[in-house]
UniProtKB/Swiss-Prot annotation:
This protein's encoding gene: prfA
Transmembrane regions: none
Positions of post-translational N5-methylglutamine modification: 236
PTM text: Methylated by PrmC. Methylation increases the termination efficiency of RF1.
Name under which the protein is recorded: Peptide chain release factor 1
Protein's organism: Streptococcus pneumoniae (strain Hungary19A-6)
Family affiliation: Belongs to the prokaryotic/mitochondrial release factor family.
Any one GO molecular-function label of the UniProt entry: translation release factor activity, codon specific
């Protein structure tokens, strides 16, 4: 099937989906309605671009016809030739754009995410850097018009984070932030360093797509739920009523503790969101590990402990090791202006996938 047949098939399917989504039987089936809605949304940009491309092709035909019928009118012929030139340039641009749009889509790209950041090697300095990363992602999310909610946080004594979990909601969140999973290294002089020596510390980031209950069922028998009293600073109980929740997924021993909310029900709901994402991610990672060759050909899906980026404060430098990108804009990037980095990662990923398709 050539590219034009593929595009026509996508448009035909898009129109079929529009009809299905107005079918009462589909509307009443929540799971099916969600699946079809997501499929329609994932094809929308391709269909819009294809329809615009067809208009450009028609513009070429019209311009060629105008040249033939100019009847010696030099001004008309010149105008038609310019229109033809512009339309042919547009045609090439659309063909490149459509090739990328036809690349296999990540089914999670449109999803919200669970973002986990942990201070790793480097003690207090690593925890402080985890806080810097949290602020960076918060500001980036704000610039994108996304909602950013801290769900769980474990702080250390100097204002850093041993671990922080956040929910980021909005349009195509996973498609942008999925490349952030991995080890982030910082090189700087800690505030506690009296000799002015540069120290190296690490924080790890994990990005998981949100998993809706209708998408991924966890057998209640596989869960152990403990209810206990929330504790404050120093470990004292701060609630007379037990509102904190610990959920353990027994087959994997994945556990989540939640005490941020005032009610047991809200803590339980948040804990279930996180554990559903972690369990789904756990099994997805196992499946991915079985496809090592494919995984290594793309970015953002490799070893979670892999060092992906270095933030060098003395040189105001950020280096993304996966694509060899170095920017002397550390202060700008940590303030949430991540577009240049994100765009480069997306472009690299698309280029790799195009090369795979052309082999």
């Amino acid at each position: 099937m050539n590219i034009y047949d593929q595009l026509q098939a996508v448009e035909d399917r898009y129109e079929e989906l529009g009809e299905l989504l107005s079918d009462p039987d589909v509307v009443s089936d929540t799971r099916r309605f969600m699946e079809l809605s997501k499929e329609e949304a994932s094809n929308r940009d391709t269909v819009i671009a294809y329809r615009e491309y067809k208009q450009v092709l028609q513009n070429i035909v019209d311009a060629e016809e105008m040249i033939k019928e100019s009847g010696g009118d030099a001004d008309l012929e010149e105008m038609a030739k310019q229109e033809l030139k512009d339309a042919k340039a547009e045609k090439e641009e659309y063909e490149e754009k459509l090739k990328i749009l036809l690349l296999p889509k990540d089914p999670n790209d449109d999803k919200n995410i669970i973002l986990e950041i942990r201070g790793a090697a480097g003690g207090d300095e690593a925890a402080l850097f985890a806080g810097d990363l949290l602020t960076m992602y918060q500001k980036y999310a704000e610039a994108q018009g996304w909602r950013f909610e801290v769900m769980e946080a474990s702080m250390n004594g100097v204002g850093g984070f041993k671990e922080v979990v956040a929910m980021v909601s909005g349009q195509s969140v996973y498609s942008k932030l999925k490349y952030e999973s991995g080890a982030h290294r910082v090189q700087r002089v800690p505030v506690t360093e009296s000799q002015g020596r540069v120290h190296t510390s690490t924080a790890t980031v994990l990005v998981m797509p949100e998993v809706e209950e209708v998408e991924y069922d966890i057998d209640p028998k596989d869960l152990r739920v403990d209810i206990y009293h929330a504790s404050g600073a120093g470990g004292q109980n701060v609630n007379k009523v037990a509102t904190a929740v610990r959920i353990v997924h027994l087959p994997t021993n994945i556990k989540v503790e939640m005490q941020e909310e005032r009610t047991q029900q809200k803590n339980r709901e948040k804990a279930m969101k996180i554990i559903r994402a972690r369990v789904a991610d756990h099994f997805a990672q196992i499946a991915q590990d079985e496809q090592d060759a494919e995984r290594k050909s793309t970015i953002g899906t490799g070893d979670r402990s892999e060092r992906i980026r270095t933030y060098n404060f003395p040189q105001n430098r950020v280096t993304d090791h996966r694509i060899g990108l170095t920017l002397q804009k550390l202060d700008t990037i940590l303030s949430g202006k991540l577009d240049e980095v994100m765009d480069a990662l997306v472009l690299y990923d698309q280029t790799q996938k195009l090369e795979e398709l052309n082999k």
